[in-house]
């Protein structure tokens, strides 16, 4: 688990780096998407989006 993106429980404050790539990020302070397939600069991306295959597309950046 990424120590920079993990929290004991949802809503806990913690440090999330801009390169947050964990798949189950619960950090409310993490403004970046944790979806690795989202392209940089996608304003619609949010935590918990679902990647579609190995492409750069995901459920919130179609």
From Swiss-Prot:
Binding-site positions, a divalent metal cation 7? 51, 58, 60-61
- Give the start-end ranges of region Beta: 1-30
Could you say which residues bind a divalent metal cation 5 here? 35, 37-38, 51
Positions contributing to a divalent metal cation 3 binding: 16, 20, 25, 30
Positions modified as Phosphoserine?
59
Where does this protein hold a divalent metal cation 1? Answer: 5, 7, 22, 25
Work out whether the entry's keyword set contains Transcription regulation. Answer: no
Give start-end of the signal peptide: none
| Lineage: superkingdom | Eukaryota
Sequence segments annotated as region (Alpha): 31-62
Q: Which residues carry this modification: N-acetylmethionine?
A: 1
Detail which positions bind a divalent metal cation 6. 38, 42, 45, 61
GO terms, biological process: cellular response to cadmium ion; cellular response to copper ion; cellular response to zinc ion; detoxification of copper ion; intracellular zinc ion homeostasis; negative regulation of growth
In which residues is a divalent metal cation 4 bound?
34-35, 45, 49
Alphabetical GO CC annotations of the entry are:
cytoplasm; nucleus
The residues that the entry says bind a divalent metal cation 2 are 7, 14, 16, 27
Mention any Pfam family matching this sequence: Metallothio
Q: Which GO terms describe its molecular function?
A: zinc ion binding
Q: Which UniProt keywords apply?
A: Acetylation, Cadmium, Copper, Metal-binding, Metal-thiolate cluster, Phosphoprotein, Zinc
> Domain comment?
Class I metallothioneins contain 2 metal-binding domains: four divalent ions are chelated within cluster A of the alpha domain and are coordinated via cysteinyl thiolate bridges to 11 cysteine ligands. Cluster B, the corresponding region within the beta domain, can ligate three divalent ions to 9 cysteines.
Q: Which family does it belong to?
A: Belongs to the metallothionein superfamily. Type 1 family.
Summary of subunit composition and partner proteins? Monomer.
Quote the function comment for this protein. Answer: Metallothioneins have a high content of cysteine residues that bind various heavy metals; these proteins are transcriptionally regulated by both heavy metals and glucocorticoids.
Indicate what this protein is called per its UniProt record: Metallothionein-2A
Q: What is the native source organism of this protein?
A: Oryctolagus cuniculus
């Amino acid at each position: 688990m990424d120590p920079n993106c993990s929290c004991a429980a949802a809503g806990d404050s913690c440090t999330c780096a801009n390169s947050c790539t964990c798949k189950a990020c619960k950090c409310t302070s993490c403004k970046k998407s944790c979806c690795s397939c989202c392209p940089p600069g996608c304003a619609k991306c949010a935590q918990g989006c679902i990647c579609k295959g190995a492409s750069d597309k995901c459920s919130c950046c179609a």
